[in-house]
Amino acid sequence: MYGAERIIFSIQYDMHTGCLHPLNDKIKLPMRHVEFMKGIFMDNITIRTAKPSDADKLLEIYAPYVEKTAITFEYEVPSVDEFRQRIENTLKKYPYIVAIKDDKIVGYAYAGTFKSRAAYDWDVELSVYLDMKCRRRGIGKLLYKKMEQILAMQNIINLNACITSPSVPDEHITDDSEKFHARMGYSLVGRFHKSGYKFDTWYDMIWMEKAISVHCTNPPAVKSFPEIEKETEKIY
């Protein structure tokens, strides 16, 4: 009667975090109802450029990924000061954006240098991190779409993602990131076998890529984020 269905968890809204949490009992809803519920959640999401003063809030999101997952190969949680410096350094050339729900930052994304040689100027590496309690709500997709719009304004062409890829998913890593990037239009272009060691395990690392513009002769010069920052206000 309703077409495709999906098993989902009963959910409860958490006023403190501004996110939806699964309860214990599972229910089955038609896919259109699931998408409707996601739409309600996403209605209250706003995007803005990150500020150095956001460092402590962003670090609260990032720290669990360092401590509990192999999504990042970083071993130690950086200090707030170091994280603030990372934001400042990124914003000198590339976008760094945050997603906000009910006045709380629930995710962030940023671009970084792919390689330092001049010929790589049209390439960036993207990263996205979400509050652990706010995953699978469409926030990552929204952040990536906004990033693509901003990077296109900068004349960036190639988007790259470096992703931990387990031969067998374990408690520290799944293949969710690879699947997410595939849904966002990224293609697998390379695998480095057992290139990262964390939690007493060797993990593969893969690269995925997406072109957001044509590869023309004499491409327009890349603009820094400060040069186009004012223009980004119209897409937030």
Regions flagged by a language model, labelled:
Residues L59-R86:
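Conserved GNAT-fold acetyl-CoA-binding loop/helix
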Residues Y110, C162-T164, E178, A182-T201, ...:
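Conserved catalytic-core motifs of GNAT/GCN5-like acyltransferases
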Residues T46-L58:
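A short beta-loop-alpha structural element at the N-terminal edge
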Residues L151-I173:
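Conserved GNAT acetyl-CoA-binding A-motif
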Residues P78-K133, K145, I150, Q154, ...:
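Acetyl-CoA-dependent GNAT
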Residues S127-R135, I163-V168:
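A short, internal acetyl-CoA/4′-phosphopantetheine-binding micro-motif in the GNAT/acyltransferase core
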Residues K194-Y236:
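C-terminal "cap" of GNAT-fold acetyltransferases
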Residues R136-L151, D175-K179:
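Conserved acetyl-CoA-binding loop-helix of GNAT-fold acetyltransferases
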